[in-house]
Amino acid sequence: MIETDIRELNEKIQRESQFVDLINLEMNKVIVGQKQMTERLLIGLLANGHILLEGVPGLAKTLAIKSLSSAISADFSRIQFTPDLLPADLIGTLIYSQKKEEFVVRRGPIFANFVLADEINRSPAKVQSALLEAMQEHQVTIGEETFKLPDPFLVMATQNPIEQEGTYPLPEAQVDRFMLKVIINYPKKEEEKLILRQNITNSASKINAVVRPEDILRAREVCREVYLDEKIENYITDIVFASRFPSDYRLKRFANMISYGGSPRASINLALASKAYAFIKRRGYVIPEDVRAVALDVLRHRIGLTYEAEAENITTEEIINEILNTIEVP
């Protein structure tokens, strides 16, 4: 790509990405800390990918997506997943209208721009698969009719750490449909003091709508234009291939630790998330640091560990970090 094209693209992105600061400003009114979580929400929104958040209750996961939807003046719905939830509770159902003497469609909470699927691993597989099908197809079928879901459509699913009781682990094939899996940690001590003050004095500010859904759709188009050099493409595929065939990449010690590596969807999502990250950083091209910044969240749920790895307390994060340290940076 020639220099003038890059310069023009940079200028275009500078113009189109101004809303990022506005959204961050609004979200910072109510969210203390958790910078990575809010940044990953924006990446998912721009790259048209869904997000899986893992963390104990009370870490502002619900507040974050609710604040984001308010800042974009979009529809928000929250679905609490429970063991007795049915697919119809999620997508909707046909109910008989005595007045019309016919069946009419009652739409479920999935019909919103931002859907918070809270504690997704507390409901059985049939409900999980109904949600994941809606995520993949951007449409649902009720009775014999198919309905398109609104655009933009972003699902943020939360799950409790698997060690907790009463949870159903998500199957690997379904987890793979989430672009990012983000681990949410406790806030720092100073941040927690701010949270404390904000909540006991009722000083939290109101979120203002600063962006329209149409602006997000336009930004997505621009995001796709971010330049990805062939060297960066090779870097991305090397990272994903190293998760499948570690011995070919001087990572022999992990050969018996990985049961399966990243799928082609991992390569696609790593490229799209890197483009969105570059967009947020006001750049018209992807650099290796962008790939490294999102690699952990894109790959951590796409690598399966063997019993040997679990016996030695090896984590997917360790493997990904070792891959990033081993693969030559272009």
Where on the chain are the PLM-derived regions?
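Pre-Walker A (pre-P-loop) alpha-helix and adjacent loop at the N terminus of AAA/AAA+ ATPase modules
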Residues: 13-59
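Conserved alpha-helical scaffold flanking the Walker A/P-loop in AAA+ ATPase domains
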Residues: 40-43, 96-116, 145
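Walker B catalytic acidic pair
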Residues: 55, 118-119, 130
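Conserved C-terminal "switch" segment of AAA+ ATPases
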Residues: 10-17, 30, 167, 181-253, ...
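C-terminal engagement/docking regions of AAA+ P-loop ATPases
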Residues: 1-8, 13-14, 248-330
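Canonical AAA+ ATPase core
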Residues: 97-101, 119, 123-127, 135-226, ...
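Walker A/P-loop
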Residues: 45-82
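Conserved beta-strand position immediately N-terminal to the Walker
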Residues: 51, 115, 153
